[in-house]
């Protein structure tokens, strides 16, 4: 018997790469997956005269593109930079926004020029309101088949812009799941002859950018919490605002302008139900009188590295 293993990793520019190994035997656990390597000189990660880079498996997923096969998430430098004691008590919910584009780089629905102003597209239905739903639905189904806890999808504020949400427990696990969900999204788009754009402001002008709002909580935030606990966390986030912005994605200044449901990149703010704040306090938290809940960090850009996000949040608040 043989097992098809598809190894997934990040190159020097944090772009996803993959290669396939047909391995002997019925492989079903991480310990059985062989360490492999690739040509790092072709990914800007090694010189040509010393080009072998090791692929170290860290998590397995059922491969939704091939029956009885596995996707292998491999270790990265930023994943290994998470050195605090990781815990399933750290909960993360990423809201990944993105545009689906055609071969020329234009968002779907923009082929004949700029559409009407934003307003009818958010959670819209109908051929004039959305574009690319087949990609979105296929991606959702394949994430479920890969045992990724995708919790929802919706059309976003601009035509051709979408969002999906992924929930995970543990800082490293959350990063693994988000990266693999991105990999599956790009593979699905490939099958539909489309591309995925996760730049934070791909469409200039009066259009929303793309973010990756990050919902997070710890055991103490969910169990017998208090307003004081939440105030302390918010104060720590404010004190470390610059450190967060530094790892919250490239070109995020183009998105965090204080317009289009964002706060200014230069100023930290928070508020109950405020989508124009750096950190939104959700209604569930407020309605519990701050005894249980979570916070939504609205600063991360759509292209941010989730390992960076989980690390800086936990480093800040613990």
Language-model segments: residues:
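Glycine-rich, acidic/polar active-site loops that bind/position phosphate-bearing ligands
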Residues: 1-318
């Amino acid at each position: 018997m043989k097992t098809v293993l598809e190894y997934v990793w990040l190159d020097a520019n944090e772009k996803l790469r993959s290669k396939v190994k047909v391995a002997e035997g019925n492989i079903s656990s991480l310990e059985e997956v062989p360490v492999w390597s690739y040509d790092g000189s072709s990914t800007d990660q090694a010189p040509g005269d010393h080009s072998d880079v090791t692929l170290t498996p860290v998590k397995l997923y059922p491969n939704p593109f091939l029956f009885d096969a596995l996707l292998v998430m491999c270790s990265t430098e930023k994943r290994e930079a998470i050195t605090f004691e990781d815990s399933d008590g750290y909960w993360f919910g990423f809201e990944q926004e993105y545009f689906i584009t055609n071969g020329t780089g234009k968002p779907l629905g923009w082929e004949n020029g700029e559409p009407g102003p934003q307003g009818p597209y958010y959670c819209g239905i109908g051929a004039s309101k959305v574009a690319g739903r087949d990609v979105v639905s296929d991606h959702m189904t394949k994430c479920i088949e890969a045992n990724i806890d995708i919790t929802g999808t919706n059309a976003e504020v601009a035509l051709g812009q979408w969002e999906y949400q992924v929930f995970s427990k543990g800082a490293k696990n959350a990063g693994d799941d988000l990266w693999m969900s991105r990999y599956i999204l790009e593979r699905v788009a490939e099958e539909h002859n489309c591309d995925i754009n996760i730049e934070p402001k791909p469409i200039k002008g009066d259009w929303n950018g793309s973010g990756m709002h990050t919902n997070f909580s710890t055991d103490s935030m969910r169990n017998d919490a208090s307003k004081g606990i939440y105030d302390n966390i918010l104060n720590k986030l404010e004190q470390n605002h610059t450190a967060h912005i530094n790892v919250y994605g490239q070109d995020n200044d183009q998105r965090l302008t204080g317009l289009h449901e964002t706060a200014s990149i230069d100023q930290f703010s928070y508020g109950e139900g405020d989508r124009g704040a750096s950190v939104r306090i959700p209604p569930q938290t407020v309605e519990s009188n701050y005894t249980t809940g979570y916070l939504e960090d609205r600063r991360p850009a759509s292209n941010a590295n989730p390992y960076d996000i989980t690390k800086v949040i936990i480093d800040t608040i613990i």
